[in-house]
C-alpha cells in the first residue's frame, strides 16, 4: 500500500506552503490515483494548515486520511478537531535524542508516548507510531517502544530512515525484526544518499505493507521516495495494478506548478526526457518496438514518446518526421540528414519544417 505524504513531508520542502485550496486540489488528485493513505498535514502547525485539512476531511475520499502529531495531547486535540481517522504520532528514542534534545530518560519518554497513544485511542483515532530516526536508535530502546505500542494496540508502526543514510541490506534486516512483533509496518525512507527507493523496496521485501512517498520526491533536505517511482515498482515488479499510472505525469506537473519546483529533465517516469529517444540506433529500434529501450511504454503513463533530432540522428529519425509531413523520399532523407548532422543545434519541430521547406525550394 501507499501512504502519500506530499501534504505533510512534502510541505517541509523549503519554499513550499500550500493554501487550503491547493491542499484540497492535491488530495483529490492523489485519491484519483488510488493511494491508500493521504497524510494530510500537521494541523498544529498553523491555522491555514488546519483549515486545509478540515477541507479535505469534508470530502468523501476513498483514501484513509492521517494527520501528523507530536507526542503531545494538545497536538492530538488538533487532529481530533480536524475530523480525520488516523493520527501519526512520532517521537525520537535514541540515546542521543533523549539526552541532548529532550533531556529525559527512556522511561520518561515511554510514559509520554504511552499517554499520547492512549489519549488518541480514547478519542477513537487509529494510531501509527513512528520511533523517529528508527535506523539509528539503539535496539533496546526500539524494542521497549515497540512492545509498548503493541500493548497499547497501535494500528501501525513506521520504520523511519530519517537521515537517509542506511544501507538497504541493513534496512531490510531492521524491518524484518520489527515485523516480527506482529504490528503492521510502514517504511519512511529519506533520500539523502540516493537510497530511498532501494530502502523502500527492501522494506517491502522485509515485510512492510505501506511505503511513504511524495509527488516528485518532495520533503526535508533531499526528500523521500518518489510516488511515481514506487507505484511503478509495485506495478512492474510486484504485479500491483490498482494505482492509476496514467495520472502520475499529470499530478507531477500540477505539484511542480503549485510548488514552483521544477524537475530535472531526466527524472524517472515523469521527467520531460523520460520517454525521449535521441541516438539514431535507439530511435531505429524504438520505432520497431518501444520495448527495446522502454521498460514500459510511454502510453502506460499517459505520455507520448518523443524522438529528438540533432546530429546524433539516423535515417530512421529523419524518415519518421518526414512521413509525418507526408514525404516519402529516400534521397531527400539523405539530404536532410546531412544537413542535420552538420548542425550543432537541435532541430525542433518548427525548425525541422522550416528546413524541409528551405531544402525543397
From Swiss-Prot:
Entry's Gene Ontology molecular function annotations: homocitrate synthase activity; metal ion binding
Pathway: Amino-acid biosynthesis; L-lysine biosynthesis via AAA pathway; L-alpha-aminoadipate from 2-oxoglutarate: step 1/5
PROSITE patterns in alphabetical order: AIPM_HOMOCIT_SYNTH_2 (PS00816), PYR_CT (PS50991)
Pfam families, sorted: HCS_D2, HMGL-like
Chain sites annotated for binding Mg(2+): 9, 188, 190
Keywords assigned by UniProt, alphabetized: Amino-acid biosynthesis, Lysine biosynthesis, Magnesium, Manganese, Metal-binding, Transferase
Binding annotation for 2-oxoglutarate: 8, 68, 128, 162
Main function: Catalyzes the aldol-type condensation of 2-oxoglutarate with acetyl-CoA to yield homocitrate. Carries out the first step of the alpha-aminoadipate (AAA) lysine biosynthesis pathway.
The protein's name: Homocitrate synthase
Source organism: Pyrococcus horikoshii (strain ATCC 700860 / DSM 12428 / JCM 9974 / NBRC 100139 / OT-3)
Amino acid at each position: 500500500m501507499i501512504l502519500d505524504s506530499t501534504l505533510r513531508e512534502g510541505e517541509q520542502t523549503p519554499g513550499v506552503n500550500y493554501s487550503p485550496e491547493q491542499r484540497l486540489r492535491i488530495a483529490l488528485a492523489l485519491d484519483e490515483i488510488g493511494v491508500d493513505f493521504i497524510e494530510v498535514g500537521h494541523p498544529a502547525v498553523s491555522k491555514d494548515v488546519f483549515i486545509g485539512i478540515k477541507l479535505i476531511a469534508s470530502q468523501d475520499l476513498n483514501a484513509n486520511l492521517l494527520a501528523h502529531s507530536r507526542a503531545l495531547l494538545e497536538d492530538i486535540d488538533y487532529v481530533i478537531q480536524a475530523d480525520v481517522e488516523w493520527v501519526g504520532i512520532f517521537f525520537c528514542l535514541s540515546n542521543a535524542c533523549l539526552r541532548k534534545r529532550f533531556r529525559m530518560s527512556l522511561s520518561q519518554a515511554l510514559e509520554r508516548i504511552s499517554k499520547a497513544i492512549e489519549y488518541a485511542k480514547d478519542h477513537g483515532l487509529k494510531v501509527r507510531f513512528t520511533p523517529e530516526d528508527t535506523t539509528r536508535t539503539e535496539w533496546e530502546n526500539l524494542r521497549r517502544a515497540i512492545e509498548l505500542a503493541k500493548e497499547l494496540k497501535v494500528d501501525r508502526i513506521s520504520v523511519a530512515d530519517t537521515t537517509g543514510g542506511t544501507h538497504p541490506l541493513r534496512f531490510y534486516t531492521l524491518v524484518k525484526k520489527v515485523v516480527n512483533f506482529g504490528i503492521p509496518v510502514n517504511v519512511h525512507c529519506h533520500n539523502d544518499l540516493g537510497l530511498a527507493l532501494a530502502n523502500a523496496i527492501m522494506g517491502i521485501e522485509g515485510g512492510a505493507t505501506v511505503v511513504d512517498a511524495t509527488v516528485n520526491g518532495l520533503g526535508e533536505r533531499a526528500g523521500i521516495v518518489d510516488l511515481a517511482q514506487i507505484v511503478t515498482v509495485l506495478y512492474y515488479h510486484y504485479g500491483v495494478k490498482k494505482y492509476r499510472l496514467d495520472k502520475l505525469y499529470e499530478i507531477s506537473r500540477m505539484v511542480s506548478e503549485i510548488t514552483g519546483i521544477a524537475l530535472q529533465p531526466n527524472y524517472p517516469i515523469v521527467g520531460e526526457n523520460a520517454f525521449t529517444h535521441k541516438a539514431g540506433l535507439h530511435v531505429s529500434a524504438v520505432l520497431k518496438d518501444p520495448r527495446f529501450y522502454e521498460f514500459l511504454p510511454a502510453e502506460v503513463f499517459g505520455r507520448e514518446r518523443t524522438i529528438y533530432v540533432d546530429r546524433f540522428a539516423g535515417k530512421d529519425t529523419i524518415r519518421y518526421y518526414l512521413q509525418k509531413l507526408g514525404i516519402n523520399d529516400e534521397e531527400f532523407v539523405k539530404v536532410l540528414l546531412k544537413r542535420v548532422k552538420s548542425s550543432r543545434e537541435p532541430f525542433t519541430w518548427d525548425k525541422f519544417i522550416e528546413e524541409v521547406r528551405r531544402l525543397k525550394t
